[in-house]
Every structure is written in structure tokens, then in C-alpha cells.
Amino acid sequence: MLISVLKSKISYATVTGKDLFYVGSITIDSEIMKQANIIENEKVQVVNLNNGERLETYVIKGEPNSKTIALNGPAARRCEIGDQLFIISYTQVDPTRENIKPKLVDLKTGD
């Protein structure tokens, strides 16, 4: 048996763009992805702090150091530019495994 646990969390990501007619996904600056240990096409949960919306999508790699956080496709209707997001990924682990340390990136403080 496996359980889902927090793998990575990007806190206080600011929406910089949205493209309603793109196929789908969230575009994230590749440097932020690297800091958070999130890879391209990984499934993530997106939580919008401004309106309480939650959604699941997959990640597209954005230009490095661009600070891009852009929701694409139908997800673009769930946010506005300037909204603050939590972007969360999970992994499956054996429940007997201890000392699982998620990668946390806080864009508000720069940690």
C-alpha cells in the first residue's frame, strides 16, 4: 500500500499571465520549477488564495528567470492576473517511510 504525501509546494506564486485558448496546463518559470523539484508534465494542484478555487493540471516549463506563472486553457477562467497561488505536488510513498521532507519554495519571502 502507498499513501500520498506532500512532495513540493510553491507558496505565494503571482499569476503573471493566462491563455484561455491554449490546450491546458500551468506554465512555471523553469528556475522556480528546479527550486521546487517539480518537473515538466508533472501533475499539480493549484490553490487560488484570492478566490478559493482549486484545480489540478500539469506543468509546462517556462523561460528561466522570467517569473512566469501562467494558467492556460479552461484553468485560465479560475484566476486573474495578480492572484496569489499555492502550487502543490504530491508523491506516493510507503507509509512506513519516515523523515519525508517536502521541498518548499516561498516566493513571498524568497525562500
UniProtKB/Swiss-Prot annotation:
Its cofactor is pyruvate. Its main location: cytoplasm. Catalyzes the pyruvoyl-dependent decarboxylation of aspartate to produce beta-alanine. The modification Pyruvic acid (Ser) is found at S25. It comes from Francisella tularensis subsp. tularensis (strain SCHU S4 / Schu 4). Substrate binds at T57, G73, P74, A75. This is Aspartate 1-decarboxylase. GO terms for cellular component: cytosol. It catalyses: L-aspartate + H(+) = beta-alanine + CO2. InterPro entries: Asp_de-COase-like_dom_sf, Asp_decarbox. Pathway: Cofactor biosynthesis; (R)-pantothenate biosynthesis; beta-alanine from L-aspartate: step 1/1. Binds 1 pyruvoyl group covalently per subunit. Belongs to the PanD family.
